[in-house]
């Protein structure tokens, strides 16, 4: 992008559908671009229309092509439509993963199952404490 200070939103899944939540946020200051990933979900196919298919995952090629620019991953909660693809994503991602305490147990289990580094999972501090991830400042609010 040529303009300074652009906020980008790239839904990889979860928009106009139920499940498969995965959202990329980007910030371009004109020199560098930083990304964060919010959620990493899957959806479950209808066996009537997709026999033999266990899970459907968003296309993560954008993430794979921009790995070094991803500063963090934030998981909102431990439902499969928000966390289910961690098993597969962590074949290649090395960014820290922030989530709540309960969600951290599920995330570590999924990453271990996929052969990734579960030490990347961090329990997010509650707001007003802020997590700095590249150009982003993120606060976790319990609902």
Positions of PLM-derived features:
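C-terminal regulatory/interaction regions
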Residues: 1-2
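Catalytic core of the metallo-beta-lactamase
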Residues: 5-12, 17-29, 129-143
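Pre-active-site segment of Zn-dependent metallo-hydrolases
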Residues: 17-20, 27-75, 87-88, 92, ...
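N-terminal Rossmann-fold NAD(P) dinucleotide-binding loop
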Residues: 82
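Short, structured coil segments at secondary-structure junctions
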Residues: 92-93, 134
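Metallo-beta-lactamase
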Residues: 103-143
């Amino acid at each position: 992008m040529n303009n300074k200070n652009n906020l980008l939103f790239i839904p990889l899944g979860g928009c106009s559908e139920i499940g498969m939540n995965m959202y990329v946020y980007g910030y371009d200051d004109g020199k560098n671009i930083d990304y964060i990933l919010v959620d990493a979900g899957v959806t479950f196919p209808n066996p009537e229309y997709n026999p033999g298919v266990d899970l459907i995952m968003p296309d993560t090629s954008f993430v794979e092509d921009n790995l070094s620019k991803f500063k963090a991953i934030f998981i909102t909660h431990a439902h499969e439509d928000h966390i289910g693809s961690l098993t597969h994503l962590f074949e290649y991602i090395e960014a820290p993963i922030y989530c709540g305490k309960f969600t951290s147990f599920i995330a570590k289990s999924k990453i271990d199952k996929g052969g990734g580094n579960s030490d990347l999972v961090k329990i997010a501090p509650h707001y007003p404490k802020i997590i700095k991830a590249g150009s982003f400042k993120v606060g976790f609010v319990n609902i």
